[in-house]
Every structure is written in structure tokens, then in C-alpha cells.
Swiss-Prot record:
Protein name from the UniProt record: FUN14 domain-containing protein fndc-1
Residues linked to a glycan: 85, 111
Reported tissue expression: Broadly expressed in somatic tissues. Expressed in the hermaphrodite spermatheca and male gonad. Expressed in spermatids, but not expressed in oocytes.
Subcellular location: Mitochondrion outer membrane
A GO CC term assigned to this protein in UniProt: mitochondrial outer membrane
TM ranges: 37-56, 61-78
Cystines in this chain: none
Family classification: Belongs to the FUN14 family.
Keyword Transmembrane: yes
Principal location: mitochondrion
Assigned keywords, A-Z: Autophagy, Glycoprotein, Membrane, Mitochondrion, Mitochondrion outer membrane, Transmembrane, Transmembrane helix
UniProt topology in membrane: Multi-pass membrane protein
Length: 138
């Protein structure tokens, strides 16, 4: 355990303890795939739990914001502040669809998901489990 309150012998350079703590954290994070599987699982679970908790709490705020924005847009359309040219929207959507399909069909799709998942399987497994724990805690 790193003591964050230690000082550098009174020389006025506080923060050596914080520097040591940051170095310790970076040691585990930078080369995480080289660590033991249980360390990878633990780090993934920790980050997943925090992420799941904040996604659940923040998701309510985002949902409320999107809902209120949608209602305000519908009210503005109803009152005539906003007018939609549906034929122009349809034409632009067709052009966008053609453009995307031309770009996608001409290129080979690179599949990196298999190697990524197999390389980081312990971290991803811990993260997924941590997300579920974070969802249940929130």
C-alpha cells in the first residue's frame, strides 16, 4: 500500500507519495495484458463496476434530456416554428444511403474483433461482470 501523505524529508516537495501511487497504477494499467489473469479480471471488474454505476445514474439524466428535447421539438413543429420539407429529407437520405453503400461495398472489412477479444478476454470478462454489478448497485 502506498502512503499518499508522506513528504520528501521536509524539502517542500510534497507529492512524492502521489507520484509513487500514480507510478504503481500506471505499472498495472500500461502492461495490463502481461499481468496475471486474476489481476486483469480484477482491474476489469473495478472499471466495469464504476462504469456501470455511472451509466445507470447518468442514463436517467440523458433519457430525461432526450425526452424533454423531443417534446419541445414536437411543440415547436406544432406551433409552426419549425417546418420540415419531407421530400428534401427523403432525397438527402437516399443520397446518403447510396454514398455509404458505395464506400462500404468497395472495401474489405477488417475483422479485428477476434484477436482483440482473445487478447483481452480476462479484462473484458471482468469489465462485463463489473458492469452488471454496477447496474445492480445503482
Amino acid at each position: 500500500m502506498v502512503d499518499l501523505s508522506k513528504n520528501d524529508g521536509g524539502s517542500g516537495k510534497a507529492g512524492k507519495g502521489v507520484s509513487d501511487a500514480i507510478d504503481t497504477v500506471l505499472y498495472y494499467v500500461v502492461d495490463l495484458k502481461k499481468q496475471q489473469p486474476m489481476v486483469q479480471l480484477g482491474v476489469g471488474a473495478g472499471f466495469g463496476t464504476v462504469t456501470g454505476y455511472f451509466v445507470t445514474k447518468g442514463g436517467r439524466l440523458v433519457a430525461a434530456t432526450v425526452g424533454i428535447s423531443f417534446l419541445l421539438a414536437q411543440f415547436a413543429i406544432h406551433k409552426g416554428y419549425i417546418t420540415l420539407n419531407e421530400s428534401k429529407i427523403e432525397r438527402d437520405m437516399k443520397n446518403l444511403h447510396k454514398s455509404v453503400m458505395n464506400k462500404v461495398s468497395g472495401k474489405k472489412v477488417i475483422n479485428i474483433s477476434d484477436s482483440f477479444v482473445s487478447e483481452y478476454r480476462w479484462i473484458l470478462g471482468g469489465f462485463a461482470a463489473g458492469m452488471l454489478i454496477g447496474f445492480s448497485v445503482a
